[in-house]
Amino acid sequence: HGFTPWFETGFYIFTSSRNGDGVDWVGDHIRPRFSIPEKWHWPVGLSISNEIGYQRHAFSPDTWTWEIRPIIDKKLGRWYAAFNPAFDRSFHGSGVSKGFEFSPNFKFSYDFTPKIAGGLEYYGALGPVTGFDPLKDQQQQIFPAIDLNFSPRWEFNFGVGVGATRGTDHLIAKMILGYRFDF
């Protein structure tokens, strides 16, 4: 996780569980992230991550991808808000010709207790930055979600997302289980 107060690296293993298909390995991503140190006391948190990953063709027409994700967040009392205006690019697959695509994400949550937070998450994929896809072809999902902070090292996030457009999966569940390593 954190090599310094301003640099961390995440590694993701993606899986899929479909009715009748069992559990499949989808792919892996690595995400180095640089942050403005908290000791600088900026009014908002600011960081940027670069995520490079592989997804099997059975799960994505674009098997090798790159994402640049600025992360702007703020904690006010028990409330948390984050905006991640991500830019994605395919290196291999049908989306290569699209160039960079805009994929905004938002999160708003409330700490019910020091260990339990709940809120809404939004994930969008609007299309190429040179001209967004028609609304019906965009991917837009809203997830009621819960965060469980078991300890400073362990985190858990779960949500059930509803697709808001024809181009989106209509119902999807997501889960993140994270462990922070110190080096």
Task: Locate predicted features.
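Transmembrane beta-barrel domains of Gram-negative outer membranes and organellar outer membranes
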Residues: 1-183
